[in-house]
Amino acid sequence: MPRKGPAPKRPLVVDPVYQSPLVTQLVNKILLDGKKSVAESIVYGALEGARDKTGGDPVVVLKRALDNVKPAIEVKSRRVGGSTYQVPIEVRPTRSTTLALRWLVGYARQRREKTMTERLLNEILDASNGLGAAVKRREDTHKMAESNRAFAHYRW
């Protein structure tokens, strides 16, 4: 194993249009095959659409959507004496943001709209209203943690 320790965390470059690190993270999650300009046009198009449909600041809409998707608790597999338990653990804030963005983009990709911009826009709007597949994923995660609460003492 390497003895140098963990790699230092690189600072996130702030988005040039909205001055928000969240938008930068969203662009990086959309990114495929290194085509950053394509990812940026998808995200900016979706945020412009959010501005048109809500009449408000699109970054606020995105933050509201993320707050509705962020999990507070999740389950991790833990092997104890030959059987595997799903142990509920709290989610760190950075991980919850990352998971929320990952779920938002993942379920936007599965939607049926014609362009990725429309899919992302509608998933963000649904999530900000407490609807959509990403919010359902969070509810399922919380339900799973709640049903396995008996194993919470196996935490590490």
From Swiss-Prot:
GO cellular component: small ribosomal subunit
Entry keyword set: Ribonucleoprotein, Ribosomal protein, RNA-binding, rRNA-binding, tRNA-binding
One GO process term, biological-process aspect: translation
Molecular functions (GO terms): rRNA binding; structural constituent of ribosome; tRNA binding
Stored Pfam families: Ribosomal_S7 (PF00177)
Family statement: Belongs to the universal ribosomal protein uS7 family.
Subunit structure and binding partners: Part of the 30S ribosomal subunit. Contacts proteins S9 and S11.
Function: One of the primary rRNA binding proteins, it binds directly to 16S rRNA where it nucleates assembly of the head domain of the 30S subunit. Is located at the subunit interface close to the decoding center, probably blocks exit of the E-site tRNA.
Official protein name in the record: Small ribosomal subunit protein uS7
Gene: rpsG
